[in-house]
């Protein structure tokens, strides 16, 4: 089986039925100043059971493209948010 990329992020939006938007933070070193800088990116995640809420921290795994912008499936809810 091929390696599947796994991402962890914070749910920032419930975008329609069975879809959530998560914000993923990564830290990269600036090439000139050698300081770690936070970079952010949003991903659309498929949530089959509509189980996540805004503020949850989740884990998602890469899958085949489910729509034009959605290529991740919900794996687990790591920490429940406050909503």
Curated annotation (Swiss-Prot):
InterPro entries: NA-bd_OB-fold, Ribosomal_uS17, Ribosomal_uS17_bact/chlr, Ribosomal_uS17_CS. GO terms for molecular function: rRNA binding; structural constituent of ribosome. Disulfide bonds: none annotated. GO terms for biological process: translation. GO terms for cellular component: cytosolic small ribosomal subunit. The keyword rRNA-binding applies. It holds the Pfam family Ribosomal_S17. Keywords: Ribonucleoprotein, Ribosomal protein, RNA-binding, rRNA-binding. PROSITE patterns: RIBOSOMAL_S17 (PS00056). Belongs to the universal ribosomal protein uS17 family. NCBIfam families: PRK05610.1, uS17_bact. One of the primary rRNA binding proteins, it binds specifically to the 5'-end of 16S ribosomal RNA. Part of the 30S ribosomal subunit. This is Small ribosomal subunit protein uS17. It comes from Campylobacter hominis (strain ATCC BAA-381 / DSM 21671 / CCUG 45161 / LMG 19568 / NCTC 13146 / CH001A).
């Amino acid at each position: 089986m091929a390696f599947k990329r796994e991402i962890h992020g914070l749910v920032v939006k419930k975008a329609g039925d069975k879809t959530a938007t998560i914000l993923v933070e990564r830290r990269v070193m600036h090439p000139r100043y050698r300081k770690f800088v936070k970079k952010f990116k949003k991903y659309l995640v498929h949530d089959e059971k509509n189980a996540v809420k805004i503020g949850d921290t989740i884990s998602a795994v890469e899958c085949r493209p489910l729509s034009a912008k959605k290529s991740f499936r919900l794996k687990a809810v790591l920490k429940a948010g406050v909503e």
